[in-house]
Amino acid sequence: MSTWANLGLQDSASPLMEQLIFFHDHALLILVMITVLVGYLMFMLFFNNYVNRFLLHGQLIEMIWTILPAIILLFIALPSLRLLYLLDEINEPSVTLKSIGHQWYWSYEYSDFNNIEFDSYMIPTNELTTDGFRLLDVDNRVILPMNSQIRILVTAADVIHSWTVPALGVKVDGTPGRLNQTNFFINRPGLFYGQCSEICGANHSFMPIVIESVPVNHFIKWISSNNS
């Protein structure tokens, strides 16, 4: 989750989020290099009166400022396109989770084993325990196995919602009458927090998401206990 005074991205908990962070750093490095170059050129123009004194035409410099941006755009576009295809790729899932957005809570369905359904509401501030997180904790967490391919299907029952967990690099719109899907791979245990990221009404900020990532054997025990 995002902690106090955290100015960067959240720590990743999935390979896709790691790739997103790498691309962010890659693009930021290119932007810093461009900023330094432009700043240096502006400094030279301001404080050197003779740099262009005999410049009548500049075919070479025009070639440079045409070709160089094209090369820079390629260095940004190729990793970006690769990442876009990786984000859309659906691998063979071990578990499928269905998430349905409502005003203003989430409901979940596990249908791979037998039908397990539950609603997940935000815990009000006056009912929070001392170690709870305000506006982020829920009464029923989503339990998912770590080191497994997870597919999530997202839809909505009323208005457009968006199921978002930043640590996993996942953001899927939930649209009434439409079923959207994506996949992710959780590579460490823990609690991962998210929120609805599409303005959906008065209590939009009161429908958080909590994923509890557990080892596979604990997940099987949880499924078995819910079956019984």
From Swiss-Prot:
Q: Which ranges make up the Mitochondrial intermembrane topological domains here?
A: 1-26, 83-228
Q: Which PROSITE patterns match?
A: COX2, COX2_CUA, COX2_TM
> Quick one: which residues bind Mg(2+)?
E198
Question: Is the Membrane keyword given for this protein?
Answer: yes
Task: Report the co-factor binding details.
Answer: Binds a dinuclear copper A center per subunit.
Q: Which SUPFAM superfamilies match?
A: Cupredoxins, Cytochrome c oxidase subunit II-like, transmembrane region
Q: Which reaction does it catalyse?
A: 4 Fe(II)-[cytochrome c] + O2 + 8 H(+)(in) = 4 Fe(III)-[cytochrome c] + 2 H2O + 4 H(+)(out)
What residues does Cu cation A2 bind to? C196, E198, C200, H204
User: What are the binding positions for Cu cation A1 in this chain?
Assistant: H161, C196, C200, M207
* Function field: Component of the cytochrome c oxidase, the last enzyme in the mitochondrial electron transport chain which drives oxidative phosphorylation. The respiratory chain contains 3 multisubunit complexes succinate dehydrogenase (complex II, CII), ubiquinol-cytochrome c oxidoreductase (cytochrome b-c1 complex, complex III, CIII) and cytochrome c oxidase (complex IV, CIV), that cooperate to transfer electrons derived from NADH and succinate to molecular oxygen, creating an electrochemical gradient over the inner membrane that drives transmembrane transport and the ATP synthase.
PANTHER family in UniProt: CYTOCHROME C OXIDASE SUBUNIT 2 (PTHR22888:SF9), CYTOCHROME C OXIDASE, SUBUNIT II (PTHR22888)
**What's the name of the protein?**
Cytochrome c oxidase subunit 2
The organism named in the record is Drosophila simulans (Fruit fly)
Traced from the root, the source organism's taxonomic lineage reads: Eukaryota, Metazoa, Ecdysozoa, Arthropoda, Hexapoda
Point out the gene that encodes the protein. mt:CoII
